[in-house]
Structures are given as structure tokens and as C-alpha cells.
């Protein structure tokens, strides 16, 4: 699992190497969920942080990975729940 640094502390990422605040690698994504997070991070870098279109793409990417019977599927559900309720900035306002 990836880690992020905060004031010298190493804090684990939410999931994999790319899922969670401050978790933008390094390292390859560990699976398809982590790939969705990497794509989301790259989208924010390109379109700006909190771009609605990036959050919508993340939700689409995670949609078929949600499965409450598996740990991995529950992670996808948790990330989806967060971003479906988060405020974002419409792309036309950037």
C-alpha cells in the first residue's frame, strides 16, 4: 500500500498507491480500482482540482467494481459514495 508524507510521518493511502488524499504514486496501480484513482489524479492535474468531469469519470470507472461481498468491492463503494456526495467545480467555471 502506498504512503503519503505529512510533517515527516508516513500515512497510508486509502487504497493501493493512488487512492486517497496526497496519494499520487509512486508505483504502478495495484489493480483496476487503483487504476481508476490514478486516472482521476491525472484528470485533476489536467483539468484542475475538484473538476466535476473528473469526479464523474471516476464514478463511471468504479461503477462495475462495486461489490459489497468483497473487500475490494466495498472499497470501490466507499470511494464512489464519497465522490457522489462531494462538491465539485463545473468545468465551465475553471
What is the meaning of each model-derived region?
Residues 1-94:
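Extended terminal accessory/targeting regions
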Amino acid at each position: 500500500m502506498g504512503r503519503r508524507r505529512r510533517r515527516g510521518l508516513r500515512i497510508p493511502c486509502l487504497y493501493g498507491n493512488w487512492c486517497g488524499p496526497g496519494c499520487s504514486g509512486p508505483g504502478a496501480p495495484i489493480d483496476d480500482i487503483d487504476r481508476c484513482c490514478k486516472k482521476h489524479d491525472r484528470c485533476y492535474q489536467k483539468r484542475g482540482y475538484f473538476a466535476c468531469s473528473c469526479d464523474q469519470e471516476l464514478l463511471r470507472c468504479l461503477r462495475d467494481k462495486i461489490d459489497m461481498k468483497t473487500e475490494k468491492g466495498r472499497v470501490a463503494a466507499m470511494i464512489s459514495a464519497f465522490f457522489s456526495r462531494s462538491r465539485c467545480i463545473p468545468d465551465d467555471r475553471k
